[in-house]
Amino acid sequence: PYRRQRQMCIRDREASDITLLDDSFHSIATAVMWGRSLYKNIQRFIVFQLTINVVALASVLLGAFFGTELPLTVTQMLWVNLIMDTFAAMALASIPPSADVMNEKPRKTDDFIITKAMRKNILGVGFCFLAILMTLIVIIKQMPADLVGQALTQFFTIFVMLQFWNLFNASVFGTNHSVFKDSRHALGMLSVAIIILVGQILIVEFGGKVFRTEPMNFMTWVYIIAGTSFVLWIGEIYRWIKRIQKKD
């Protein structure tokens, strides 16, 4: 009888959608919260990755049409891909599960993972970044030949820093929260951000012919980092407005 009962339990477990091992319905809620949070983190990764892809491909393609030197080299694109894949995955995977996802409506199993809001974000942010970069390409084309090398280095750094700040916005995509709300979240993002920033500085200052870069002075770094940070602050203002509207 014991063996038969055990076989029945095994069959029931295999046939069931959910099996409670600790006789607690709290386990179901926890599992759903983790599942929804993981799904949202995947969506955030897609938003960040596709935005970089759209901007990088479009800027290289349009730069060729303008008849300028390739704005991004192969080795520079390898660094961008490292940011896009490895570092972005590390940063977004460090986001802890949030109980807020339990307030969202259940999604259908056949829903496409790229939602309307994601498409708007990818295309909207991508278009803004592309407009900035194409303006820089036009300016670089009109520069004297001896200044082009430094200008292309600044172009590369601006491109990376735009994505750098956008990574913070992507980490809270789908919510109205501030990037600075959760200290655990901020710590994980800050660690990855430091790695990206230090890596970019090393590539620019010591990359030389391999990365087609020229060293930049301290104030140029300050101007680029501060100037591109508008990406983060616009995102913060937008989410703040959304929070105010939600309260009203």
What is each stretch, according to the model?
Residues 163-167, 231-239:
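Alpha-helical transmembrane segments
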Residues 1-10:
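Single conserved hydrophobic/aromatic residue that forms the stacking wall/gate
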Residues 205-221:
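Extracellular/periplasmic helix-loop-helix junctions in multi-pass membrane proteins
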Residues 11-175:
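Membrane-embedded transport module
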Residues 161, 166, 188-203:
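Hydrophobic alpha-helical membrane segments
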Residues 114, 118, 175-195:
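C-terminal membrane-solvent junction of multi-pass transporters and transport-like membrane proteins
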Residues 237-248:
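Membrane-interface capping segments at transmembrane-helix boundaries
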Residues 132-136, 194-209:
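Hydrophobic alpha-helical transmembrane segments in multi-pass integral membrane proteins
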